[in-house]
Amino acid sequence: NIEVKAGEIVGIAGVEGNGQLELVEVITGLATPDQGQLLINGVNLTKASILERRKYMAFVPQDRALMGSCLNASIKENLIMTHYKLNPEFTRHGHILNDKKSTEFAYEIREKFDIQLHSIEDEMKSLSGGNQQKVILGRELLLSAPFILLDQPTRGLDVGSIEYVHQQIIRMSKENRAILLLSSDLEELFRITDRILVLHRGQIVANLITNETNINEVGYLMLEGAAHGA
């Protein structure tokens, strides 16, 4: 079982290929679990559609180019993804996109997340990797969902962008969001999480308080699936 409380940042540590992809797919609705339930704020989302889950869940995927964005679409279009399906203010007569609302919202995210761009009408691929990640983060975090799933959110980013992402994650936890962070960077997990769950061969083999463990212990658990000497 994985439980993440409101205001808590829980990290998932594990050697890649030990069930991380399957975990993300089950949580987001891309795969059906063999057993168990997915509950967010007491709402059973186990059989809910992907769109229904998005009312309760923000998701920053590992592959920002293929899953997190559409590089050939405009920055504005990327910023309103999901929002226009969940918020009726983004459409008129149920189908026509409200361009005024979409533009205002895009500029709001640009300001809040300090996205460096020339025009919101430019293609997403015109942005640096760090600014692309800011677009995805801004879009997802403004969903106001109680649960945030982050899959390798800083992979491939420069030091400044990594620090910015960490600040946003911590800010969201202070807003009482429950955050689950998958990362192959143990230093990242030790820097910002409250607890670390170790994933080994598809099973959670340890549930550790971050400031009561160390990188060596977590690393050993990742490799062996049990504590040293157990």
Report residues per predicted region.
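A short, surface-exposed alpha-helical micro-motif characterized by mixed small hydrophobic
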Residues: 189-191
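Helical segment within the ABC ATPase nucleotide-binding domain
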Residues: 163-175
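Walker B catalytic motif
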Residues: 152-153
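Conserved P-loop NTPase catalytic core
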Residues: 24-127, 206-210, 214-226
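H-loop/switch region of ABC-family ATPase nucleotide-binding domains
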Residues: 183-184
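Conserved catalytic motifs of ABC-family nucleotide-binding domains
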Residues: 144
